Amino acid sequence: MIYLDNAATTFPKPECVYTAMDSFARHAAVNAGRGAYRAAREAGEMIRETREKLISLADAREQAQVVLAPSVTVAINQIIHGLTWTEQSVAYVSPYEHNAVLRPLEQLRKKIGFTVLELPLAEDLSVDLAETERMFAELPPTFVAVSAVSNVTGYILPAEKIFRMAKKYKAFTLLDGAQAVGLLKLHFAALRADALTFAGHKTLYGPFGIAGFYLKNGVDLNILLSGGTGSQSESLEMPRTIPGKLECASKDTVAICGLHAALDWLPSAHTLQREKELTAYLMERLPTVDGLTLYCAPDETCQAGIVSMNLEGFSCGEAAAILDAKYDIAVRAGHHCAALIHRHLNDAPCKGTIRVSMGYFTETGEIDLLLEALRSIRREDLKNVDLEALRGLC
């Protein structure tokens, strides 16, 4: 299989991740913080080390605490539902946001009745900073959510500039780093984010089952989930300090062990440099494919290793299904859980895109095979492919 769906999850993982998880699962996968015996203490120490590595990664020492969660969607729900909302609240979201942000906000908006607005885009689909500043002045924000990197076009959004404006109005700022933490060099203090989320299985090259967020020191959240924590068990109340206040239930120590190993591997991998090289290689050669419409960042300086496209004569679902069935190439088709941005793309009426997302282990030869497959799909009549059976996948 030629795997080009790294925005969904990076695959494969570094070999050290598989080795660490296998060994830990066989010999040390006990419940951390739930016992005084050696193995439980060692599991707890491994979790502490993982938090420390995450703090170092985002240069967040003495700036933030790391709260762990089983997925970044859970983490974002903890943040959004952990805030206090009123009818007077004003939330701004970029059009690039994922449903992990949009759906919790919509749920609360319907219940409470506050305002949700989209950040404006310029003609090239970059965030219009001047218009953003004007909108903030006209209707001051109480909450601003921005994706660090679009999971549709690979656009690296100007989060620091947006949050600098938002902080003039003391807004809570949320940076969705699912496609960025581990890839971009982030300095937590410079971001001006109150919360920065991460997904272990994406740009951190760890496994599923471990994610979380950095929460700025001094920022508090209401409790969404309650239960056992392994501490203060004599009380019916959750612990009052972070991260314990926001973490309940047994942790997936095997997944955390995998992330621990990935964090040791990342500094030497230079994944951003690798993605930029691969993206440049792809972009230089895409014009050789007739009938291709491309959706990407406004320019290469703000482009990560994710690009979207559509192929004339085929729905995104049809093209992706043919790439899979005939060429064993894995890409994503659809709206990528980010429908708002599709309203701004030239794929009206919002039919979705073919997404190609590269990772550290992608080879240039695999990109060549993708390009040749796209050319072949355009050349052939495909009479032997049951397109009717493929419709509706998008």
What are these regions (language model features)?
Residues M1-C394:
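Pyridoxal 5′-phosphate
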